[in-house]
């Protein structure tokens, strides 16, 4: 992880609980382009490293703060972690379940860190572009939970406008046999995603060595195939 994330970085350890450490950080921020922190707002205030503390010393400073749950609200000062704030609280942990009876799945270590970093990067670069136009720095932020919700935004925004969802089904009871995943003879897994089913169905049948299915009246149309999904 260090080799991937920290190329060309230099490190400096500061004890920000002491005035001497804070003074060094303030001197660095006074000549920096971007200051990045993942401390919650309350901790920043205690250490004297909020935007209001640092910006007066450097009007061109881009102050970028990243948190678990955002800059404001009841949860602003809660510590956040990839597996809880990004994965669980956003609803992603539930959305990947096959059905309501399936045990929720854990996320891969750091699963949300990279997409969150890209969103954060976008905020910082936008602020730098703004500074090129105005000469002024600014405060930008992002958080784990917001990025998790964004990852699930197709469903989240649908729910916000009153959409109704079909009950989720396990792969063994799928509504559509040609949009599903299967274990092959060599124990590897294959996932099918026929986005234009009417056009792609004959090709799939040929690839499977089952051209007879193309003319089988039970599976002649998309409606027929869905009605007999388990049989297919």
Q: What is each residue range found by the language model?
A:
Residues 1-56:
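A structured beta-alpha segment of the ubiquitous adenosine-cofactor-binding alpha/beta core
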Residues 4-6, 13, 65, 94, ...:
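Structural signal for conserved beta-strand scaffold positions within catalytic alpha/beta enzyme cores
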Residues 6, 26, 122-125, 202, ...:
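Generic alpha-helical structural signal
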Residues 8-13, 101-106, 232:
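Short glycine/proline-rich turn/loop motifs
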Residues 9, 28, 40, 55, ...:
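Short, cationic motifs built from Arg/Lys/His that form the positively charged side of catalytic pockets
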Residues 31, 45-190, 194-195, 202-203:
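Active-site-adjacent "lid/gating" segments in soluble enzymes
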Residues 178-232:
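Aromatic-enriched alpha-helical interface/lid elements that frame and gate functional surfaces
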